[in-house]
């Protein structure tokens, strides 16, 4: 049964607050996890001082950012300099609104979807919202009136626009197979098993190449190693956020990790069955188990991000652009054509 309008608004506000709180907490502890894992990979301990196992380190870092001196250099173009981090973080956090986290639940006879808003063009909306984030990066580089920031902003803009094409094409194969832009429909199309034991996830259903293209493009879109050229410290000091400090720098930091989580959510929904798990649990856990599987898959992708950061070197800029245009884009086109032929037959 559909919710009355006032109750719908109340439920939407509650869901928005819960999802935003969980997302910001996940951002904070993804940073903690990265420092811990990379520390162990480099034979260090990582955070250990603040709380048990350093678990309160994110809170300490947040307090530090709040109390740091917020400098605005006199040579910057102030309106855009202040707007750039807001643009980056707002659109990074907004994209989570259409991501479903599990099956709809029934409370008091009302069916409530586990997402802030259920739209039938969810995937298209996410691609549109996340692509706007490049404006924050470009404006940060230009408004800083600094050669290193400008080069970092130019690199980020070119990189994100170039890999956006491969990212979009890598998802068309999934759209052809599911026949819908709705993320919930895409997940439902991946329910069940092949031969009773292999999950019907898209990665096992002819979309391995599409997933590879998506993963490579996602690394470039989020400016992460091995594609973190916009922030290459040895070349550009700190890239487009060289002139930023305190909470304005923290906003760019939050935007980067929020985008990582969004990318992990999309990979889970589109290629790994979303909340459909490889194993079934007892009936008493049917309401909780889908959310558990979804969270576990997201954790796996975030761990992969961190693992790659600790093991791979940075590409040169010419290698980055050549890889995107000469290898990844043709490969995504081949996957699209092969999927279309397979579905037509």
Task: Kindly give the residue locations of the regions a language model identified.
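Selective transmembrane helix interface/packing segments
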Residues: 1-345
């Amino acid at each position: 049964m559909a919710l009355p309008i006032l109750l719908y608004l109340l439920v939407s506000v509650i869901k928005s607050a819960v999802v935003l709180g969980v997302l910001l907490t996940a951002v904070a502890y993804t940073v903690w996890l990265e420092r811990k894992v990379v520390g162990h990979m480099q034979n260090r301990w990582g955070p250990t001082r603040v709380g048990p196992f350093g678990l309160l380190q994110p809170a300490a870092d947040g307090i530090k950012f709040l109390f740091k001196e917020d400098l605005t250099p006199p040579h910057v173009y102030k309106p855009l300099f202040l707007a750039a981090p807001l643009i980056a973080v707002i659109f990074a956090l907004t994209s989570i609104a259409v991501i479903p986290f599990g099956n709809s639940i029934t409370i008091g006879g009302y069916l409530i979807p586990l997402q802030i808003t259920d739209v039938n063009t969810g995937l298209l909306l996410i691609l549109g919202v996340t692509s706007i984030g490049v404006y924050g990066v470009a404006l940060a580089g230009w408004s800083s009136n600094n050669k290193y920031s400008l080069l970092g902003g130019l690199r980020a803009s070119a990189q994100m626009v170039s890999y956006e094409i491969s990212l979009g094409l890598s998802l068309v194969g999934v759209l052809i197979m599911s026949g819908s832009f709705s993320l919930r429909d895409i997940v439902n199309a991946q329910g069940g098993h092949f031969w009773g034991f292999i999950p019907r996830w898209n990665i096992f259903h002819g979309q391995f190449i599409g997933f590879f293209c998506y993963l490579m493009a996602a690394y470039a879109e989020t400016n992460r190693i091995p594609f973190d050229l916009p922030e290459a410290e040895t070349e550009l000091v700190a890239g487009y956020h060289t002139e930023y400090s305190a909470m304005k720098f923290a906003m760019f930091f939050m935007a980067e990790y929020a985008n990582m989580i969004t990318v992990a959510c999309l990979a889970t929904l589109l290629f790994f069955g979303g909340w459909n798990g490889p194993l079934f649990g007892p009936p008493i856990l049917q309401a909780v188990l889908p959310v558990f599987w979804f969270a576990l898959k997201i954790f796996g992708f975030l761990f992969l991000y961190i693992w790659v950061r600790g093991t791979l070197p940075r590409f040169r800029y010419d290698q980055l652009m050549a890889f995107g245009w000469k290898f990844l884009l043709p490969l995504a086109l081949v996957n699209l054509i092969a999927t279309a032929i397979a579905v037509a037959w």
